[in-house]
A protein has these predicted regions:
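PLP-dependent amino-acid enzyme catalytic core
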Residues: 1-195
Length: 195
């Protein structure tokens, strides 16, 4: 019915040129082909769907999120498809391309000046989102940095897909690595792969 139904189910791809015939197999979860172009669309969708289930969103809600990029792209996409307004707050040092994508999805992008300390700038973005929420009852801040639904997107989705793919191929997992931002990807997938 809509593009959000295509989120997930990304392929697990074997990297053949990185290893020799007697080395371990290296497999990557190819999230670049996910709707929205990254793994963050999974978390955006999960956080918004769970918020809807809890009654935290209404038709006039404004989704506001501080981010350095890909989560904003995912939330802008999900908001556009579901009919919500979106405001993404990000450091001005983040890529112009990401900003443009979010704007094309209909999000308002608010840039906070980065004085050279990205951590301080992100904290300023978070504080601005919190002020917006305090000032306007329509504002919903998913809070990717502390939202357990971020983790659940990987437990229920990404990790389950990896396990299904390796089991179908008869492959045992000896190790796992992941990029690290909010910690949701590595924590969610890692917790499931340990079991």
């Amino acid at each position: 019915d809509n593009v959000l139904e295509a989120v997930g189910s990304t392929p697990l791809v074997r990297l053949r040129r990185m290893t020799g015939p007697d080395d371990a197999q290296v497999l990557v979860k190819f999230e670049a082909v996910n709707v929205g172009g990254s793994v963050k669309t999974r978390t955006a969708l999960k956080m918004i769907e769970r918020a809807e289930e809890r009654g935290e969103l209404s038709p006039d809600s404004i989704i506001v999120e501080p981010t350095s990029g890909n989560q904003g792209v995912g939330l802008a996409l999900v908001a556009a498809v579901k009919g919500y307004a979106a405001r993404i707050i990000m450091p001005d040092s983040c890529s112009v391309e990401r900003r443009r994508i979010m704007e094309h999805y209909g999000a308002e992008v608010i840039c906070v000046h980065d004085e050279g300390d990205i951590g301080a700038c992100i904290r300023e973005c978070i504080a601005l989102a919190q002020r917006m929420a305090a000032d306007d009852p329509r504002v919903f801040v998913p809070q990717q940095f502390v939202n357990r639904d971020n983790l659940a997107a990987h437990v229920d989705g990404t990790a389950a897909e990896i396990l299904a793919d390796v089991r179908a191929a008869g492959i045992a997992i000896d190790g796992f690595c992941s990029g690290f931002g909010t910690g949701g990807t590595i924590t969610g997938i890692g917790s499931e792969l340990r079991t």
